[in-house]
Amino acid sequence: MSSLGSLPLPVSPDNDPLRDPALYINRELSQLDFNFRVLAQAMDPQVPLLERLRFMCISCTNLDEFFEIRAAAVRHAQEFGLPPAPDGMSPQAILTAIHDRAAELVDQQYRCWNETLRPALMDAGIGVLGRHSWTDRQKRWLRAYFRNEIMPVLSPLGLDPVHPFPKILNKSLNIVVVLKGTDAFGRAGHLAIVRAPRSLPRIIQLPEKLGGPQNFVFLSSVLSTFVDELFPGMEVQGAYQFRVTRNSELVVDEEEVENLALALRDELVDRGYRPAVRLEIAQDMPRDIVRTLLQNFGLTENAVYRIDGPVNLNRIIQLYDLIAQPDLKYPPMTPRTLRDSDGIFETTARQDLLLHHPFDAFTAVLDLIRQAAIDPNVLAIKQTLYRTGKDSLIVDALIQAARNGKDVTVVVELRARFDEEANLGLADRLQEAGVQVVYGVVGYKTHAKMLLIVRREGRKLRRYVHLGTGNYHSGTARAYTDISLITADADIGNDVHLLFQQLSGLASKMKLKRLLQSPFTLHTGILGRIERETRIAAAGRPARIIAKMNALNEPQVVRALYAASQAGVQIDLIIRGACTLRPGVPGVSDNIRVRSIVGRFLEHSRVYWFGNDGAPEMYCASADWLERNLLRRVETCFPILDPELAKRVYREVLQNYLDDNLNAWELDADGIYHKRAPAHDEAPHSAQMALMQGL
């Protein structure tokens, strides 16, 4: 492999035409577009019914997170007068466009539910019953259920000078009730708020004797129907559900705090009540009530979304587990397992191991840590943890290793978004077991996926390494596509050793032999390799780049790709989510093709391939080509050195996905995605299906 120093970097003057805002797609709008592609899976009759339901719920969950993080960041940029994005849009213009595009997505989500999935479930013998369709027996049972199970935990709050507008928790279900009459103290009724505690199930299953084994109702329907029982002697003139979404980005000045864990715990207490960014309301909510809510949440009209159904569609995902009909789900997949996982050290000493999850079982990674925990020759284990899931067997193995006398160091990233609380608990648990826990580097999230095992073999110490594109999380390893490399390569082992020195100590920047690392060499390394392909093409020789990742928005990388295309480099980008690069622009990106794959498994692997004048380089990484990953995180990018394994990655992860004509969406120069379909002379090909069938 070429050394980094031999790769000159492109230099762009300020007046570079490749900075033209017209050449860039807005990142927020591109991210929203991904959710339309997910929702399209919910509309596909070829997908099993409950999986379609799951895809709809995923699109809703994604939209929630989009507002909590991305839209909140744009609103922050607007408030502080930050400059336009590379696409030239001002924060205000972005917010307006977000509202219009998100409103379209919400409309499609509810039409998908009301007009497609709900009737299809009914045809399959699964009833999700609206309150106007309840029989008298069902209504009597639900009234009793309300009185016995729901009413005791509700605390309705009247709105008057003594009872100001209550604090409303982020994404919680609430009912605003319009009242007429006077209460026991002679107070005139007007408005009240009923908050539904999260302890209550959002979907209630009716007994089989009331019409069948698989009939369900929404909690919101039950609350709206029987809310009058909370206000005896008052007349309920209307009950309208609403849900507010709040900014959920934690703000901790890491350079000022003395104890990051303590500061995060304090922030988590207030996260559910931070500034509002979106208000979802019942379709028939009167204008005067809408104005009251907007005033109390500090929002304007472009934050309002009227919905035709329950305000939290993603809670319908509960049906996926409640309904016992395997024929309505994807058939189970049995992943490949290593033939000799018991001797994983001996196997790895002979040759590198490459795993393509979920088609290859994640148990091989777990077995590696378990064996290290009990192997008397293992002296030390070092690992990074970003997301692990509940009841992690990997964490159990690390604790066992510490109790067995191994020197165990774990870098726990406390700021993993929405896993902060779980990771704080994880850090406490590891420390109690004697594990040395560090929290990474101030100002940089540790997103790298690294495991280092130091083992005595005869008179020498040998390093075994696992590097991955995905988290040490058994759950996501079954649902996400990722690459794992297990190797005993001495250079890689030393590089990983140096990285852990940086993370756990105060070591200076060190030169790595094999790995590229954010925030130091990965950005320049990618730019340098793109520039090398540009020079090769300019010399009249074939040049090509293929890269697969989750998202692309780093402006220097985009400009370098444009320049490479202008020189004649053939570029294929497989980007699941947001992409700010505009392909197919005449004279700029004619030679760039962008596609997104959306299928059964979430595409999560990051793979970069450079033709290198006939001596190709293959890399896998924890990083996307995003500003945050390349410049503000600790990330690793590792080479696949074994030629046969590199060919396998090319075949399975790159060419296989470029051949997909069933789950692929192709991006055009106008920023619009088009679903790929087999041509009349093409055989249908699904990349994920081919991998499940063993290619």
Model feature map: region roles:
Residues Q570-I574:
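Hydrophobic alpha/beta core scaffold segments
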Residues M1-I545, E554, A563, A567, ...:
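N-terminal localization/anchoring segments of enzymes in phospholipid and broader phosphate metabolism
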Residues N550:
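Cofactor-pocket helix-loop regions in the catalytic cores of large enzyme subunits
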Residues V557:
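Polyanion-binding catalytic cores of nucleic-acid enzymes and NTP/SAM-utilizing transferases
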